[in-house]
Structure formats: structure tokens, C-alpha cells
């Protein structure tokens, strides 16, 4: 890694289909942020071949077994929805949450579960703390716009994270999250 450039980490998920759907969009934004260096945090249980097709033609390091260090060292992360969104918040790094699946999977999930938010951070806080780019909104233009925004307003996100810590510190975060999901 280049120590003189601020780091932005991509966490494209742990499932092969997530990696294949999300990572190709994420890596395209590198060209819009030449003052930053980018890295992919390789998921546990995955290896280089799981990422090779998605990064073909791009020069981006994939680093395994260092996810928390990468998140801590980053000025921002772009995270596929899941537990990594909460982990990124707990480590204090501003993030954008993204998610892409097949149209049919998304359509079925949307009909079964009517949630206001998909990221654990936003669900627990019951407001948008981190921007969510879902399905067609997970594209180069919106990712670039959102990343520029959080690089500027990272203090607001970090302040909201402090409120999140307070909620989690009180205990019962699992029950609170379940209750909020059931209310939706």
C-alpha cells in the first residue's frame, strides 16, 4: 500500500454472487479518486480466484485476514450490506452501504420483508446514518457522488456512530434490532 495516499476499502461481501454483482461496480470508481488508494478486503473462506473475474483489467490489491486493520486505516469504506456494516461503524469508519442481487431475488425479498433500511446501522438508529445504494442505485455515478459526500461530511457520520455506541452499550441490541424489524 502507498502510505502517502488515504485508503478506501471495498468490502464486497462474502458470498460469491455478492462479489460478482457488487465488486465490478465498486472498482470502476477508482478513476474518479486519483488522490486515494483502494483495496479490497478479501472475505474469510474466499481466495483470489473468487475475485479474479470481477477485477479483471484493474490493478487493485486484495488483502486477506486484515479486514479490521483495513477498515480502521481507511478514510471511508464501501460495504456490501450485512454484519460488516455494523463492524465498520463500530470501528468508526464512514461508509456507504450497497447491495445488488438478481432482480427476482430482490423482488421476492421486497414483497416478503418491508424494511425502511437494509443496513444494521440504519435499522438500529432508525434513521439514515449511512447511505444505502441498492440494486440499480449501486452504480458508478451514485457511488462516486456518495463517496465524495462522505469524504466531506465524515464528522456527522462519526457523531451518529457515537449515538449508535450508546444504544449498543445499553445492551439488548439484538432485541432492539428485532423489534425495529418487526415494526416495519
Model-predicted regions and their roles:
Residues 1-184:
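Nucleotide-activated sugar donor-binding and catalytic core shared by glycosyltransferases
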Amino acid at each position: 500500500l502507498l502510505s502517502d495516499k488515504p485508503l478506501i476499502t471495498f468490502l464486497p461481501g462474502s458470498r460469491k454472487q455478492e462479489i460478482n454483482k457488487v465488486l465490478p461496480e465498486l472498482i470502476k470508481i477508482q478513476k474518479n479518486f486519483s488522490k486515494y488508494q483502494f483495496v479490497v478486503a478479501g472475505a474469510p473462506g474466499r481466495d483470489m480466484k473468487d475475485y479474479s473475474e470481477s477485477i479483471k483489467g484493474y490493478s487493485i490489491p486484495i488483502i486477506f485476514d486484515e479486514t479490521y486493520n483495513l477498515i480502521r486505516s481507511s478514510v471511508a469504506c464501501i460495504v456490501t450490506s450485512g454484519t460488516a456494516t455494523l463492524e465498520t461503524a463500530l470501528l468508526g469508519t464512514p461508509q456507504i452501504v450497497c447491495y445488488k442481487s438478481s432482480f427476482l431475488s430482490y423482488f421476492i425479498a421486497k414483497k416478503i420483508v418491508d424494511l425502511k433500511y437494509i443496513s444494521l446501522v440504519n435499522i438500529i438508529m432508525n434513521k439514515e446514518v449511512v447511505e444505502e445504494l441498492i440494486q440499480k442505485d449501486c452504480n458508478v455515478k451514485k457511488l462516486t457522488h456518495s463517496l465524495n459526500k462522505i469524504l466531506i461530511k465524515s464528522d456527522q457520520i462519526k457523531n451518529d456512530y457515537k449515538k449508535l455506541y450508546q444504544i449498543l452499550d445499553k445492551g439488548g441490541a439484538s432485541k432492539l434490532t428485532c423489534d425495529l424489524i418487526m415494526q416495519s
